[in-house]
Amino acid sequence: EIHPFNAVTVDTVRSFDPKGIIFSGGPASVTEATTPRAPVELFKMNLPIFGICYGEQTMVAQLGGEVTLSDHREFGRAHVDVIGDCVIFEGVWKTGERHQVWMSHGDRIDQLPDGFRAIASTESAPYAAIANDDKQFYAVQFHPEVVHTPDGAKIISNFTHTVCGCGGDWTM
């Protein structure tokens, strides 16, 4: 199910008993006080969460990390260096490899929240992908949902199937 950020409450989420949550991207800057935020209670529901672009930034900011407005906006094709193994990369990417992705962001993550580690980086985005394996929180600065990230669908599938345990009886 898809729900807009401003119409979601924890009770709404509980009512459909999800196996995981995906925070999507968006054009806003997390550095502005009036931009979208996830309900804080979602982070306490013991559900896997996957953040995409703005979804990564808001996750980091809300969990105690640091996000700033970047001097270098990334837009278009980029190459990420895989710097850590992770369940969302299983069967897709390995540590030491470089892969094409699609970036579109103006914010920069400068410090991760406690418990997180970097799993991929670019020259200007040291936290292009992050993981907190204990909480099953994962996030990427790039856009796995677009065709310009060739392995993106596999990364999303690893989150939905492997991490969340969803069956394959639904479509994207």
Q: Predicted regions: what is each one?
A:
Residues E1-I52, Q57, L63, K154-M172:
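Flexible gly/pro-rich beta->alpha loop and the following alpha-helix that scaffold active-site loops
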Residues F23, A33-I52, Q57-A153:
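Pocket-forming structural segment of enzyme catalytic cores
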